[in-house]
């Protein structure tokens, strides 16, 4: 019987030992002053016989305890049974107090778990709604790890070999990651939200107000980013409706310049509508305990109505929020540049590009999408979902479909860990393939969790049009994720550290051979997801993980296992996906050339960016970099110092220390009297108010300028 197994409370398997049962019975007997060695052994043997007779190969620990209780209750010493049950109850309580679940809950209540509190720079863990969400996340994560996910997937996650993203939401809940909302379909056809039947809007002000409500509802039903794709074109009909109202009123009142009057009013109404939308987004709290992580894609509209929306979005962002004109973190703005439309002087929308440059120099956003490169890399044009997740091309009935599609989730690989474990390159790729197998298994659990989900769990998504469909309450939602309509992504982190650990022969930027080695690793990952797509029919994609929290977590776990290793674990963070080491001093053009090879391989998610000094008075320099990027990368972001001190009036770059941010002029570090804005990964954060985790803070501190 030595091979008979016991399934412990954490799901692990141990060898059955009858002596442990006998010892527990002895303790219970001793507690009620009964000394009967034969009795204890006899009950132990009876328990063992029943286990071996009725169970094949293994038994759950709780089943064993139930059998022991039944045998004791039927014995000549029922008081021993009572003592055993009380003893077990006390042990259960003590065990519960020592459990990881209890420790994490206490860390939240006592505000002592810094890792949890600073995990997401968009969540203010000091306020009750966020704490409630974090508490739910702790429980959901615990349940998923113990009752839903396969044991080997959980172990790989716990060890830091992979990272199962957003475990605090899915797979406990049948939720997905990020999406492009079908705003056009919802507004044009109407929909129901809560108790209200929403009809098509009759003005741009109403359209933006409804858009804000849609964003809040959608963001509460998913755990990733919410993107409104081509918002300037989607909302342009409502600008026209408002304009026609103003024309009609002018005619009714015999206004001399009817068109001039209507144009003046619609410009004001459009500006106010998007100002309200920006304020709504930044004052809303979703049920996820955070401001909606929302992205607006715009810039391709050519009508005067679309141009007016583009101008309103950018002018409102330049103006800022509130009396101090603070830089808003959301919505993330993504402006599209296209040859013949707005790239060069003489293009009809070149003036909008100039406004976008001014805005980026003052507010960091907008990031830019280079139209031709987005099409080349992803197969069609669309904005990113959230900060960097991109969908591939997909058609229905001969028409390209983008809006209403989504990403089902991400599992990321710890590449530096594999390099640290490997003796040579051959060993690295052998282990990488093993980790790829477990990552695929983990990703398939995301698909499986959604297979029998009914539309009624998220009416806004599946019944009212956000996902581009109007299913009935009892219809399964899995059908809309198949055949490439939704993506599901393999992520990765730390190409820089992986190359250092594996080859230890200099900086990847300076060595052409090392560059090829880094590209080869990502190509290997890209080939793997293509195979998975053929095997399953689902649109697996390779995603360059933003790693806001992961840069810290993976490095921390690897330091614990391997120690401090120069060039790998010594910084306290891992470099974001394929990005150039943040400490490497190069110009923005060379940085673009270094990174441009990766997005075509990792077409499911990417961004490139540059670090700049204050360039508000040198927009030509920024435009030159934007233009250089056009034929090289699909997606580019501008990081520039825009911090403000409300004590002394300083504007520029605050000093970044391991403990926070300090005004270089007056030393002010009061978070209520400063505005500090930094790019976290693909999106911005306000680390003065909501601190980064230790690894991300260190990474931000080490960033050097590229111009």
Swiss-Prot record:
Tell me where in this chain the Glycine radical domain is found: 584-707
GO BP terms, alphabetized: 2'-deoxyribonucleotide biosynthetic process; DNA replication
- Which molecular-function annotation in GO is an example for this chain? ribonucleoside-triphosphate reductase (thioredoxin) activity
Q: Where is the ATP-cone domain?
A: 4-95
Q: Name one Pfam family in it.
A: ATP-cone
Top-rank taxon, per record: Bacteria
An example Gene Ontology cellular component term from the record?
anaerobic ribonucleoside-triphosphate reductase complex
Regulation of activity is described as: Activated under anaerobic conditions by NrdG, a tightly associated activase. Activation involves the formation of a glycyl radical at Gly-682.
- Reactions performed catalytically: a ribonucleoside 5'-triphosphate + formate + H(+) = a 2'-deoxyribonucleoside 5'-triphosphate + CO2 + H2O
Question: Which family, according to UniProt?
Answer: Belongs to the anaerobic ribonucleoside-triphosphate reductase family.
* Functional note: Catalyzes the conversion of ribonucleotides into deoxyribonucleotides, which are required for DNA synthesis and repair.
Q: Can you say what this protein is called?
A: Anaerobic ribonucleoside-triphosphate reductase
């Amino acid at each position: 019987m030595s091979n008979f197994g016991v399934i412990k409370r954490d799901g692990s398997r141990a060898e059955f030992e009858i002596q442990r049962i006998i010892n527990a019975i002895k303790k219970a007997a001793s507690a009620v002053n009964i000394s009967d060695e034969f009795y204890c052994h006899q009950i132990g043997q009876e328990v063992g016989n029943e286990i071996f007779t009725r169970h094949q190969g293994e038994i759950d620990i709780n089943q064993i305890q139930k059998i022991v209780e039944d045998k004791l209750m039927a014995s000549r010493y029922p008081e021993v049974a009572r003592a055993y049950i009380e003893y077990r109850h006390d042990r259960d309580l003590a065990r519960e107090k020592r459990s990881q679940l209890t420790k994490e809950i206490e860390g939240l209540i006592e505000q002592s778990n810094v890792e949890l509190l600073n995990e997401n720079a968009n969540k203010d863990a000091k306020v009750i709604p966020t704490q409630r969400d974090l508490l739910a996340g702790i429980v959901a994560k615990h349940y998923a790890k113990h009752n839903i996910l396969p044991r080997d997937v959980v172990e790989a996650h716990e060890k830091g070999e992979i990272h199962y993203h957003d475990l605090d939401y899915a797979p406990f809940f049948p939720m997905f990651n990020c999406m492009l909302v079908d705003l056009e379909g919802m507004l044009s056809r109407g929909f129901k939200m809560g108790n209200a039947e929403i009809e098509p809007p009759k003005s741009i002000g109403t359209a933006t107000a409804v858009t804000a409500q849609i964003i809040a509802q959608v963001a509460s039903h998913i755990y990733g980013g919410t993107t409104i794709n081509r918002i300037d074109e989607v909302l342009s009909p409502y600008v026209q409706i408002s304009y026609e109202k103003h024309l009609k009123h002018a005619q009714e009142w015999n206004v001399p310049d009817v068109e001039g009057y209507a144009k003046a009013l619609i410009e004001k109404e459009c500006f106010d509508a998007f100002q309200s939308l920006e304020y709504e987004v930044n004052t809303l709290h979703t049920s996820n305990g955070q401001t909606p992580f929302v992205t607006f894609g715009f810039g391709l509209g050519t009508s005067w109505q679309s141009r007016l929306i583009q101008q309103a979005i950018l002018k409102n962002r330049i103006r800022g929020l509130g009396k101090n004109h603070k830089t808003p973190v959301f919505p993330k703005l993504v402006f599209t540049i296209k040859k013949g439309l707005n790239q060069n002087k003489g293009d009809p929308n070149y003036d909008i590009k100039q406004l976008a440059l001014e805005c980026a120099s003052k507010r960091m956003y907008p990031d830019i999408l280079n139209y031709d490169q987005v099409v080349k890399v992803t197969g069609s044009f669309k904005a990113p979902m959230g900060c960097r997740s991109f969908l591939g091309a997909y058609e229905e009935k001969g028409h390209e479909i983008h809006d209403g599609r989504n990403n089902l989730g991400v599992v990321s690989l710890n590449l530096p860990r594999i390099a640290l474990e490997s003796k040579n390159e051959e060993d690295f790729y052998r282990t990488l393939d093993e980790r790829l197998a477990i990552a695929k298994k983990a990703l398939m659990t995301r698909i499986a969790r959604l297979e029998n989900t009914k539309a009624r769990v998220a009416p806004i998504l599946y019944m009212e049009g956000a996902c581009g469909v109007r299913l009935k309450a009892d219809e399964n939602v899995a059908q809309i994720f198949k055949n490439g309509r939704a993506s599901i992504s393999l992520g990765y982190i730390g190409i820089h550290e992986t190359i250092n650990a594996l080859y230890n022969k200099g900086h990847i930027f300076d060595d052409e051979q090392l560059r090829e080695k880094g590209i080869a690793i990502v190509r290997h990952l890209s080939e793997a997801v293509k195979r998975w797509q053929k095997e399953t029919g689902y649109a697996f994609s390779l995603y360059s993980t933003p790693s806001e929290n992961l840069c810290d977590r993976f490095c921390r776990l690897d330091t614990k296992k391997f120690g401090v290793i120069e060039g790998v674990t010594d910084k306290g963070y891992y470099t974001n996906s394929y990005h150039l080491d943040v400490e490497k001093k190069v110009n923005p053009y060379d940085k673009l050339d270094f990174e441009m090879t990766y997005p075509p391989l990792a077409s499911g998610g990417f961004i490139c960016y540059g670090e700049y000094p204050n360039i508000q008075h040198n927009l030509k320099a920024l435009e030159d970099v934007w233009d250089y990027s056009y034929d090289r990368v699909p997606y580019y972001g501008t990081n520039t110092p825009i911090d403000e001190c409300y004590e002394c009036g300083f504007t520029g770059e605050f000093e970044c220390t391991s403990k926070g941010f300090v005004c270089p002029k007056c030393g002010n570090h009061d978070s209520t009297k400063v505005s500090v804005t930094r790019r976290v990964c693909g999106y911005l954060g306000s680390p003065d108010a909501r601190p980064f985790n230790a690894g991300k803070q260190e990474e931000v501190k080490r960033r050097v300028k590229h111009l």
